[in-house]
Amino acid sequence: MSAMDLSSLQTVIDTAFDNRDTITLSTKGEVRDAVEQSLALLDQGKVRVATRGEDGQWTVHQWLKKAVLLSFRLNDMEVVKGGPGASTWWDKVPSKFEGWGENQFRAAGFRAVPNAVVRHSAFIAPNAILMPSFVNLGAYVGEGTMVDTWATVGSCAQIGRHVHLSGGVGIGGVLEPMQAGPTIIEDNCFIGARSEVVEGCIIREGAVLGMGVYIGKSTKIIDRATGEVMYGEVPPYSVVVAGSMPSPNTMPNGLPAPSLYCAVIVKRVDAQTRSKTGINELLRD
């Protein structure tokens, strides 16, 4: 079958997903071809699960998430070779690097340190660096970004250009529920060691998260200067650290009620200051 245009791909994928209970390992023809082509386009970075408009708003292309989900119904489990000591794995998603040699790595233009795992349909842009880390299917990692040791980039997560994901960082994946958007880290962000950003939250351009900051949809993000409380999105060029919110309540035993975790914006800087100032200096109170 010849390659379909994006509009045709979307139509086939949407229809197949609406009838997904009929999709099995034996499904052939147009549906299988459309899913495989969609995943190949994701893998090559020619399409993305989410794209940013000129107004800064992100548009989620749900049909591409549907293509990823349909691939699980279409593909059987199989032995994956290549482990140390001739060990193997058991999965239905191949490695992005399956069959790659020197020519493919040079053409792709990024570094992949031994034990970096990237699943097929994830895109890694040129000049990115992958330390021993994990990038799940449908994700996008931008140019010049560092994915440090034991960091994980979840399914369909969108990581911008020149981002630093420090050691042990977790960027959550969002495939389901279908209406949920992916977790997004915009350009030039720094995410401190062991931090977690999940549940489709957005970290806007140039923001800095200190070590051990956890942000989900229900996490209070408090601007210390104004008292503003926000959820799900860190504003551009914000410097954020882990904090706690005192409770106004008293427990029955007369003691103050426990404080609850929050993320605190300790300052906001402009792009010029962000580019000229070291991360540690920004995080000092």
From Swiss-Prot:
It comes from the Bacteria. It is an enzyme of class 2 (transferase). InterPro entries: DapD_Trfase_Hexpep_rpt_fam, Hexapep, Hexapep_transf_CS, THP_succinylTrfase_dom1, THP_succinylTrfase_N_sf, Trans_hexapeptide_repeat, Trimer_LpxA-like_sf. Its main location: cytoplasm. Pathway: Amino-acid biosynthesis; L-lysine biosynthesis via DAP pathway; LL-2,6-diaminopimelate from (S)-tetrahydrodipicolinate (succinylase route): step 1/3. It holds the Pfam family Hexapep_2. Gene3D superfamilies: Hexapeptide repeat proteins, Tetrahydrodipicolinate-N-succinyltransferase, N-terminal domain. GO terms for cellular component: cytoplasm. Disulfide bonds: none annotated. It is found in: Cytoplasm. Its EC number is 2.3.1.117. GO terms for molecular function: 2,3,4,5-tetrahydropyridine-2,6-dicarboxylate N-succinyltransferase activity. PROSITE patterns: HEXAPEP_TRANSFERASES. Substrate binds at residues 111, 148. Keywords: Acyltransferase, Amino-acid biosynthesis, Cytoplasm, Diaminopimelate biosynthesis, Lysine biosynthesis, Repeat, Transferase. It catalyses: (S)-2,3,4,5-tetrahydrodipicolinate + succinyl-CoA + H2O = (S)-2-succinylamino-6-oxoheptanedioate + CoA. One of its GO terms (biological process) is diaminopimelate biosynthetic process. Belongs to the transferase hexapeptide repeat family. Homotrimer. This is 2,3,4,5-tetrahydropyridine-2,6-dicarboxylate N-succinyltransferase. It comes from Allorhizobium ampelinum (strain ATCC BAA-846 / DSM 112012 / S4) (Agrobacterium vitis (strain S4)). The lineage of its organism: Bacteria, Pseudomonadati, Pseudomonadota, Alphaproteobacteria, Hyphomicrobiales. The gene is dapD.
